[in-house]
Design a protein with these regions (language model features):
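Positively charged n-region of N-terminal signal peptides that target proteins for export
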Residues: 1-4
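A short, well-structured juxtamembrane/interface segment
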Residues: 46-60
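Short hydrophobic beta-strand that contains or immediately precedes a catalytic carboxylate
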Residues: 67-72, 85-88
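Short Gly/charged-rich anion-binding patches and loops
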Residues: 56, 72, 136
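Short, solvent-exposed loop/turn elements at domain surfaces
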Residues: 59, 76-79
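Bacterial N-terminal signal peptides
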Residues: 7-15
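Rhodanese-like catalytic fold shared by cysteine-dependent sulfurtransferases
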Residues: 19-48, 78-82, 86-88, 93-171
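Short coil/turn segments at beta-strand junctions that form active-site/ligand-binding loops
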Residues: 64-69, 105-108
Length: 171
């Protein structure tokens, strides 16, 4: 209940600010801040019950039809990623790239990002908590109609993690 109240207050405070941003008179129908904030609020509520422990992430990743999605850059993905993950770099997420990569919107998708790991900073450079790639990826997938998305929750030491990692960089 506290989360819902906080979410409602956030929306009530942020949406008017976002709407006021268009007072400049510079219209762009391809950019919709109020719509983004609305979808982000919906996605935030949806996400709360979909954050996984390391053990649940591993178990679910082994189930047929599950896709592990790494939305980091292709370069960082090639340096080190969770075994079995596919790469679709966040800036490249579009209707068409999702249609090619994840044609069935009901596919179970597991996501992770830089902020899930310590001990391999060159491959998983930490972002500010409010700019975590998990947040952006979750909201983006939700915006495109993907609702069967789960997120690796904890911060893990890569050297102690039970996840298997692979590299394609030859380093």
């Amino acid at each position: 209940m506290k989360r819902l109240l906080l979410l409602t207050l956030t929306i009530l405070c942020v949406v008017p600010i976002a709407c006021a941003q268009n007072k400049s008179g510079i219209a762009n129908p391809a950019i919709d801040m109020p719509g983004y904030l609305r979808v982000a609020a919906e996605a935030a509520e949806h996400r709360e019950s979909r954050r996984l422990t390391e053990e649940d992430f591993i178990r679910m990743s082994r189930e047929p039809g599950t896709v592990i999605l790494d939305a980091r850059s292709g370069e960082k993905y090639n340096e080190l990623h969770i075994e079995g993950a596919i790469n679709l770099s966040f800036p490249d997420i579009t209707v068409e790239s999702l249609r090619r990569t994840l044609p069935d919107k009901s596919t179970r998708i597991l996501i992770y990002c830089n902020n899930n790991f310590v001990g391999a900073e060159p491959q998983f450079p930490t972002k500010m908590a409010t700019a975590s790639l998990n947040l952006s990826t979750y909201i983006s997938l939700y915006s495109y109609g993907y609702r069967n998305v789960y997120e690796l929750g904890p911060l893990l030491d890569i050297k102690a993690s039970k996840l298997d990692f692979v590299s394609h960089s030859g380093r």
